Structure formats: C-alpha cells, structure tokens
Amino acid sequence: MKYEKDKNWMKIALKYAYYAKEKGEIPIGAILVFKERIIGIGWNSSISKNDPTAHAEIIALRGAGKKIKNYRLLNTTLYVTLQPCIMCCGAIIQSRIKRLVFGANCNSSDHRFSLKNLFCDPQKDYKLDIKKNVMQRECSDILINFFQKKRKNKIHICKKI
C-alpha cells in the first residue's frame, strides 16, 4: 500500500523532471508532501537561473517553506527522481523533513557519500526515513536519454569544426 502511494507521488515528481528536460535543464523533479497534499514543487533550473543551487530539491523546499511560513518542514516527505547531492542533503537536514523517497541512484563523484552516515547516525538528533529505487527504471531512463542526446549533439558539433 505505502509503495503504491510512493509510486503515485513519484509519478508527479517525474512530470517535473520532464518539464525540466523540455527547458533544457538536467531532468530532475521533486515534490514535498504534507498530509497527502503537495506543498512544494521543484525541477532543476540551474542553467536558466544561472544559479548552482537551483536544484529540484532546493526549489521544492524553498517553496514549501514560503507556503507554510516556516523553514522547518516537519512531518513531510520529499519525493525526488534522483538521489540528492550533498548540498541538497544539507538542506534536507536543516529543514528536518521526515522522509526521503528517491528514484534513481547516482554514482557520480559528488554523490559518493553515504546517505546512511548523513542521516542515520545514532548520535545525531535528526533521523530520516529513506526509501530508494521507487520507479528506478523510469527515473534513470530520463537521465540516461538526456545525457546520451547531449553527448550526440557534442559529437555533431565537433565534427562540424
């Protein structure tokens, strides 16, 4: 039952990833849910905003904070199509969300840290429930296709020169 709910919310986050892709951004989407309602939405916008912090998660958290007029986003669930980077993990810690659900795993160098170490240290006051690999195939495919297309375009540009 809970997995089906997670899947339904992830489908919405995935729609925002497709929106980011249409805008020429890295296709990552995020939503923040509180009591079965979306209170924050985000998609990667770093390129269009010329802002390295404009990740989907950050935008969703900022929007939610403004909406509820509090930077503490207690008892919320963040759905994101890709495992958060370390910057976004810092924002998750500061906002005190209760649960993180993500789709695709990331093996790039800026993701080579342990979510377990960040969020599940028994000596820390803050604990985060993490569910990974929800709609992993769909969340991975959009990224793989996006970067394959980018690489093809680079090859064509290089051949013209």
From Swiss-Prot:
Question: Which GO annotations describe the biological process of this protein?
Answer: tRNA wobble adenosine to inosine editing
Q: Where is the CMP/dCMP-type deaminase domain?
A: 4-116
The catalytic activity of this protein is classed by the Enzyme Commission as: 3.5.4.33
Indicate which residues the UniProt annotation says bind Zn(2+).
Answer: H55, C85, C88
Keyword Lyase on entry: no
Task: Spell out the disulfide connections.
Answer: none
What reaction(s) does this enzyme catalyze?
adenosine(34) in tRNA + H2O + H(+) = inosine(34) in tRNA + NH4(+)
Q: Per its UniProt record, what NCBIfam families does this chain match?
A: PRK10860.1
- Oligomeric form and interacting partners: Homodimer.
Task: Please state which protein family the record places this protein in.
Answer: Belongs to the cytidine and deoxycytidylate deaminase family.
Q: Can you say what this protein is called? A: tRNA-specific adenosine deaminase
* Native species: Buchnera aphidicola subsp. Acyrthosiphon pisum (strain APS) (Acyrthosiphon pisum symbiotic bacterium)
